């Protein structure tokens, strides 16, 4: 059976500085998600899986692994920002704000900060600021990332 290729994502030319993408979906993070992610990444911080330990540190429950939060916020942005990416060029100015607990629902949005051509005519770099929120609209994470993205028309 042949695989049908579906064209998705934005080209470099499609991004406008100042445009705000409000990424659809959202993801409720469960205690199972948190335990699995922490185990598979070998991040055995007891505050991620031991309620009494987390409470002894002042948290109301186990906390969600910070890197799981980052990956969910990032994942929510992929469809809008980087389906046509050639490469992610890094993550900058990453800052966690509110603690995320199992049961919290994460949403995200991304602002186009800048775009520039590169020395190769078939690609350009777009820089985004992505912000993640919980279900109470509290900021949980914010970071910037430059992405190398294909051009629709390499001569433009």
Residue ranges and their predicted role:
Residues 1-16, 100-156:
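HotDog/MaoC-like acyl-thioester-processing domains
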Residues 1-90, 152-156:
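Hot-dog-fold acyl-thioester-processing enzymes
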